[in-house]
Amino acid sequence: HTITHTEEPGRVSIAKGQGDDTIIRTIETNRLYGGLSERIETVRGINDAEPVACNRSVRQYTDGGWLLVSETEAFNTPLARTTSYEYNSQYRVSRINRPDGGYTRYEYDGEGRVTLEAEPWAGGGEQVTRTEYAGLRFYDNRPARVAEFRVLSDGTEIELTAAAYAYERSPLMERVTKTVTAAGSGQEQTSVEETYGEAAAYPYAAGQTKFTRDIAGVETFYDYEAAVEHGAAHKKTAVTKVGGELAAGQSRKTESFLAANDTVLVEQESIWDGENWLLLSSGAHEYDEEGRRTKTTRGNGRVSATSWMCCGKLSETDEDGILTSYGYNSAHQLVETIRSEISDGDTVITPETITTYTRDAAGRVLQTRRDRGAMTTTESVEYDRLGRIVRQTDVLGRVTATAYSENGLTETVTTPAGATLVTERHPDGSVLHEYGTGQRERCHVYDIDHNCLRETVTLAGQAIILSRTLVNGFGQNVVQVTPTTAGFLYDRSEYDEQGRLIRAWRDAGTQEGAVAMTP
C-alpha cells in the first residue's frame, strides 16, 4: 500500500492508494483577521471532479488558548451547514448552535464541572439534565445526583427521572449504588457495582469488577486468582446468583483463563443444576502478534479460524468449514467478499457468493453487486455533499429519491411509484408532521400529562385524535389511548420495580376488565 505525503506552505496533501483507487486528503490552514485561523479539509478521489467532503473549522486565539468558533460541513457549496460555539468567561463552551435551529447550552460550577445541559424539546420548552457531584474527595467528578427535567414554555420544571449515587470505599473494595426514581411511577430501580480496591488479596484484581447487581436483581460475583492451567497468567470466574443464592437452571459460571496481556486463552461456561455445575460450552483461542484472534477450538472439536492483514480480515472459516475471503483496494477499502459454496455431497445447497462494492473516497458504498451462482443483482446509492442518501436503486431497478429542506428538518421521499412521503421533525428528532400522496395528514403534539411524557397524534387541524401515548420517566408505556366510534379505549400497563410488565388491562376510562400478566 502506498501513502504519499506532500507539504507546501499552509497546505498538506496525503495521497493513499494507487491508480484509480487513490484518495487525496488535503488540509489547508490560513490566518484570518482578529486572531482567527481556518482549517479546510477536503477528501476526493483521484478521478473526482469535486471533493466528496469538504469541511471548514475556524478557531480563535484567546487567553484561554485556541477556541473552536465554528465548523462548516459541505463548505463552499449550496448545502453548507455551520455549527457555531459560544464560550463563557472561563473559556468553557456555554452554547452550541446547530444549523437545524437546535442548540445545546451548558452551565458549570466553580470547579468547571457541567451542572446543566439543555436542549430544545418538541413540547415547547427545553429538556434539561442537571448534575450534582459527590464532593467526597479532591476535584470529585463522580455524580451524586443526575436529574432529567422538561421545562415548559411558561418556565415550569417537571422532573422526569432522578438517579442518586452513593459511594463507599475501603482498601479492599469500592461500591457504587445507583437508585433511579421516575415521574409517573412509584417504583425505584436500584443497581450496585463493586470493584476491588488497591489492597485486593490478588494484586491483578485491583480495579477490576468484583460484584454487580442489576435492576432485575441478578447478581454477578467475580473472582480472580493466579492460573495454573492452559499457560494462562490469571483466571477470572464470574458466577450469577439471585439473592446471594445459586438458582437451579438459572445460575451460570463463566471461567476465563487470561494471558498476561488480558487476551482470553480458554473460556468455559457451566450451569447450576441444583447440585453440580454442568459444562455448557468451552473454547480455546489463539492470537497473532497483534492480539487479534486467529483460531477458536470448541470443546466439541469444532474449529473456526481467521487470518488478518493490515486492512482487516483476510479470510475467516466458520465452524461448518465455510470460507469467506475479503478483498481490499490499494486505499485499504473493503471492495469484495467471497463466500464459498455450500454443498452436501454432489448437491449444491448454496452456490459461491461474490459481493463486490464500489465506494467513494469517503468509504461510502455507491454500488453493491452480488453474484450468486448464475444470478447477478445490483443495487446502488447516491449521496449529497453532507453524506445524506438522496437516491437509492434496488435490485429490481426501482428508484427511491429523498430530498431535504435547507435546515434538514423536512425530508421528502419519492417512492418508485411516484408517491411522495413528507416528514417534518423538531430539532430534537421528534416527528411533528407527516403527509404525502395517498396517506392521511398527521400531526404529532408533545406535552406533559400526569407527570408523564404524552404524545398525541391527530389528523390535520388537530381536531380528531388518532392515538395518545403516555410514557413514564423510565420510558415505560403506561397508557395507550385509541379512539372508537363510542369514545376511547385505554390500554394500561403496570410494571414492577425490576421494570417487568406485571399487569395489563383495557377499559373505557374505568378500571374494569383487568388482565393480570405473570412476570
Features from the language model and the residues they span:
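Beta-strand elements of repeat-based all-beta scaffolds
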Residues: 1-519
